[in-house]
Amino acid sequence: MDFNQAQMTALEHRDGPMMVLAGPGSGKTTVITHRIKRLLEAGVDPSGILVITFTKAAATEMKERFLRLAREEDENRKQAEQGAKCAQRTGGSRTGAEKPFFGTADPGPRRREACGTSLEAAGSRVSFGTFHSVFYHILKWAYRFPAGNVISGEEKRQYFKKFLDESEMEVEDEAEFISSIINEISYVKGERLDLKYYYSQNCPEEWFKKLYDGYDEILKTTGKIDFDDMLVMCHELFTERKDILAAWQKKFKYILVDEFQDINLLQYQVVRMLALPENNLFIVGDDDQSIYRFRGAKPEIMLGFEKDFPGTKRVLLGTNYRSTKEIVETSLRLIEHNKVRFEKKLEPFRGSGRPVDFRVFDNPGHEMDTVAQSIRAYHDAGYQWSEIAVLFRTGANSGLMAERLMGYNIPFKLRDVIPNLYSHWIAKDLFAYMEIAAGSRKRSDFYRIMNRPNRYFSRDAFDTPIVSFDRLKSFYQDRDWMEERICDLEADLRAMAPLKPVAAVNYIRKAIGYDDYLRSYAEFRRMKPEELFETADKLAESAAEFATFVEWKEHAARYEEELKKQNQEEREETKDRVTLSTMHSAKGLEYPVVFVVDANEGIVPHHKAGLPADIEEERRLFYVALTRAKDRLHVAAVKERYHRKTDVSRFVEEAGL
């Protein structure tokens, strides 16, 4: 295999710290696997090599790619040896093909030992794993942890669900809240923050502390740990037991870390301890692709690596073998607007292709229709569905595209779970209002809307499965002001009855005051009310396409069935389908044709991004999206969203589009 000079410098590096800055499509995985091969060829004990990645899938893929390389090398060696024997039998002279596979004619004791085994067999003893799996292995060895003592994700969710059921805390979207709390606790542990000074992003501090302390108590009483505890405990173990640290330092002489830009503080501290005293630490990453700050990733760690490890050799893998010249130049113009980064000169290996296409559409419906039509045109021109991807800033924005692809009968797969808009609690509230306006008297519908906005209704007032307004008034007969509220609700429902779905949604939000309820709930959850308004806006936009509530409700049911069908088909990995993905989930992937949609302010950069560091992270995320494309790149924005004007993302202009 041919390597460029930068790749050769990286894979031939032997001792001491090295930082490999790997631009998009620069062949970093190839460099890592070939460096492992070179270390083994040099006689390094395979059990002393540790390769760390961030996901189990990445670790598995890295190991498989290395073993595949090793098998190929073993086969080449075998063929060379057979050729040498034939040459000797026919009296031929020794040639370069006869040289020992692992290096010089006199490899030394360890090299001679290595020559006696296959590269694949040696490679099977190299350790590949995630931070969590490696640290758990260390803790299991030190503390004799029994199998199954790591708390599962489902066990976590069940604990928090039980807590909410038994507390006075009310949340609308239980699954979303629990997921947010789990991530927040992980962040607090990973950053080793003091709860006394921590300001929760999801709920009032007293509730977060109760959730955190209760979860911690569950772990203690059950004798379990979570992934974040592994990092903390491993750090404490190495700090307190220098003898144990020395044993692991002696074992792992060479440490390679992939995607180093995603490392967090605690992971870095443990790896630094483990790499001592030789500091044979080989890190590979791209600070321009650091997009997980919300999980605790700190790109500044990579930026400060050379200061922490004096004498570090740095090499830039600056040749992009993936994308056309136009795509490389467009993405580079964008990322150069970031101030806190390594300066890089990136060059395309490929020549010119088609210009990057940027278009602005009137509204999201027009945007998604055109993208769907373009996808079909690409397929008609000979592209496989699987060669095409549509990328979004968030999964919530992918629902409309999924609906359009269903309508055009275009097969697709989801790299993220698309939230079903119609199963959102706001949708359920709006549907309940409309059901009652249409004549439903089911108690479950009244339970949903009775205090949204707050009318001070008690659940005890709805004491029968079928609700009667007369009975409700009777319950409050000694409170005139409550009877007045009941009459107001009746009048609102009568006013809604003849309205088309979109008019009914707007009436509920403005005339009834549902938006006021959303504001108060957002304040409790430490959210921006705009996040909830956006969901209500999407529902209004959907409702506008239907003449009656019955039609809208039937559409929602069909959409839910289609989503279930798509999720079931996700197991069929070989099926030819268009990819719908968030920008985060697309990292590390590539497609001949890529559509980056919704390139508008408030979406990318996200409206939550306020600080300069947040904007730089959003720019890196957009950069990741652009650099997924091999041949054709389309970027799309809209002029208007939910009947309000919206600006094109600043990143579009920065990229020169």
Task: State the predicted function of each range.
Residues 98, 153-223:
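Coupling/switch/interface segments within P-loop NTPase motor domains and analogous charged loops
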Residues 1-146, 246, 329-332, 627:
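P-loop NTPase Walker
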Residues 402, 432-657:
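Conserved helicase C-terminal RecA-like lobe
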Residues 1-12, 16-20, 50, 58, ...:
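Conserved helicase NTPase motor core
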Residues 127-130, 229, 233, 576-583:
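Conserved two-lobed SF2 helicase motor
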Residues 391-450:
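Long, highly charged, low-complexity intrinsically disordered interaction regions
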